[in-house]
A protein has these predicted regions:
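Iron-sulfur (Fe-S) cluster-binding modules
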Residues: 1-95, 105-120, 134-173, 177-257
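Membrane-embedded and interfacial regions of multi-pass energy-transducing membrane proteins
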Residues: 100-101
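N-terminal glycine-rich "phosphate-gripper" loop used for MgATP/nucleotide binding
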Residues: 122-126
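Short, well-ordered alpha-helical microsegments
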Residues: 128-131
Length: 257
């Protein structure tokens, strides 16, 4: 049940910020993405085939909402290390945490993949999972959270949409590439007839998400995931049931009476 702790952060003041004033932290980043831990059974099912897994926390939004930071990654490592979750021996786990998984420069500069790692279990939002998956292709990157909803950012610049906070993350089965956000039609059964030579019909400069998914899974030797029959997607966690709200008992107005 032991695991090794790896910290990837370039400034210790951020660690104090994460565990200090959460309001200040949220304001500092100028954005807020909320995620919920996936059911433990789903996580175990996704990782049981691997032998050595890096559980990777993210020190930004999901730390603020108490879902995917250093502390939560450590707790998940402890729980997943328990033999009772597996038919055979459990995988070996190592834990790390970087400042932001959604920034490619930080992922490359401050993240070291331990030797022998055959999968990464990411506690980031969907954008972070995909950034790590792109950086370490073809190493499988598995989401441990369901990204639920996204706040606004007023920062200048350009951002590429990678996640829509559908609340039912499927990146485990699509090679770390989101069909909801990155397919123009949010298709779940492969490319449409308008896809040509790896490009989407909306424009040659827009890659076809399903072409990317296919070739990513091919590099991972996991094309069999495309043959599996899955239940229709549940869109209710994505906001189809009305505006969403997260409550953490014991914090501010969410304090239990």
């Amino acid at each position: 049940m032991s695991f090794r702790l790896l910290i990837f952060a370039h400034d210790l003041r951020f660690t104090r910020l994460w565990r200090g004033n959460y309001t200040t932290s949220s304001h500092y980043w100028g954005q807020m993405i909320v995620g919920d831990l996936k059911p433990l059974e789903e996580i175990v099912s996704a990782i049981k085939e691997y032998k050595q897994i890096l559980v990777l926390g993210c020190g930004s939004c999901v730390t603020v909402c108490l879902s995917g930071g250093e502390k939560e990654a450590e707790q998940l490592c402890h729980e997943l290390s328990k033999v009772r979750h597996y038919e055979g021996a459990p995988p070996k786990f190592e834990m790390g945490c970087i400042l932001r998984q959604c920034e490619e420069d930080l992922v490359h500069e401050y993240q070291t993949i331990p030797e022998g790692t055959d999968a990464i279990l990411s506690l980031a939002c969907g954008a972070g999972v995909q950034t790590v998956a792109d950086a370490h292709d073809p190493l499988p990157v598995i989401p441990a959270l369901n990204t639920t909803f996204l706040g606004a950012s007023a920062k200048p610049g350009i951002w590429a949409e990678m996640c829509r906070g559908c609340g039912d993350c499927v990146l485990t089965y699509t090679g770390g590439i989101c069909p909801v956000a990155r397919c123009a039609k949010s298709l779940f059964n492969g490319p449409c007839g308008g896809s040509q030579n790896g490009s989407c019909e909306v424009g040659l400069d827009t890659p076809c998400a399903w072409a990317m998914i296919y070739y990513r899974l091919k590099r991972q030797d996991k094309l069999h995931l495309l043959d599996e029959i899955r239940a229709p997607k549940d869109w209710r966690p994505g906001g189809a049931g009305g505006p969403r709200k997260r409550i953490r008992l014991g914090l501010g107005e969410g304090k239990s009476s």
